[in-house]
Curated annotation (Swiss-Prot):
GO terms for biological process: 'de novo' pyrimidine nucleobase biosynthetic process; 'de novo' UMP biosynthetic process. InterPro entries: Amidohydro-rel, DHOdimr, Dihydroorotase_CS, Metal_Hydrolase. Catalyzes the reversible cyclization of carbamoyl aspartate to dihydroorotate. One of its GO terms (cellular component) is cytosol. This is Dihydroorotase. GO terms for molecular function: dihydroorotase activity; zinc ion binding. SUPFAM superfamilies: Metallo-dependent hydrolases. The keyword Transport does not apply. It is an enzyme of class 3 (hydrolase). PROSITE patterns: DIHYDROOROTASE_1 (PS00482), DIHYDROOROTASE_2 (PS00483). Keywords: Hydrolase, Metal-binding, Pyrimidine biosynthesis, Zinc. Belongs to the metallo-dependent hydrolases superfamily. DHOase family. Class II DHOase subfamily.
Amino acid sequence: MTAPSQVLKIRRPDDWHVHLRDGDMLKTVVPYTSEIYGRAIVMPNLASPITTVDAAIAYRQRILDAVPAGHDFTPLMTCYLTDSLDADELERGFHEGVFTAAKLYPANATTNSSHGVTSVDAIMPVLERMEKLGMPLLVHGEVTHAEVDIFDREARFIDTVMEPLRQRLTALKVVFEHITTKDAAQYVRDGNDYLAATITPQHLMFNRNDMLVGGIRPHLYCLPILKRNIHQQALRDLVASGFTRAFLGTDSAPHSRHRKETSCGCAGCFNAPSALGSYAAVFEEMNALAHFEAFCSLNGPQFYGLPVNTGWVELVRDEQQVPENIALADDSLVPFLAGETVRWSVKK
């Protein structure tokens, strides 16, 4: 029997979905991403959303100012779509290399999404412009109607929003972000080359029992919410198959400890410190390490039409404990898998 590999060497990966926040939080979390990833698609849902070219340029500079010396990292900026967004502004940002993609948040679907889109019809001229430009649309795929059960929001979104949109704009490039259900996995698998998906480590590693059985675990609470195990298994099967239109998107979403551990806690897992090793562990469990590099480093650039990174990253089989917390200006951050032992670590 062949001994398990002790080192995994892959092209430098990219994170195709990350929240870097702003202010002191940004300064704290950026290095965890910039150390490992060559590029990252940065979410625009700040308290004042990124809806203009100037705002994106200023935010990109704040991110770059927080990147430690020696880290080779490029933030890829996104535009927050609103009902009143100017299509000309979006096109200008895309042509000037400021906006890589635009993000569709259904209004009130997640953190800082109150400015989001009330209906796809309201932004159809913008989406038609994006289709012509070849500009990717990044979608938080959940309906937010009060009568829809939170565990059904993603499947309902496919039927009522995603499929009608893609039928109407057949050449629009769409990333179905952080998919969580067998419905979404099958939908993306059955789709054409204009449709891709990102998948988080938490949705591959855990299901709702892990969050709710034996006590509630607020640091596993994210949106879209963890689903039952049949959905988790469908996501695992998708990536283990070597499907090329699924790629790494951590959705790392930091909140201070007191905003997570409270009677009405915020959604989001701060997984940047341990995400790559977490993905490696999942692929190893599924005997799918042959597809690990493509998921992390090749599939995303292929969909976005970007070159792969030139550098390399090594992960070593070296059990390490994830810190219980990370210092923040007036509080602390509890990282994903805090206090737990992880099997794979990025070689420094």
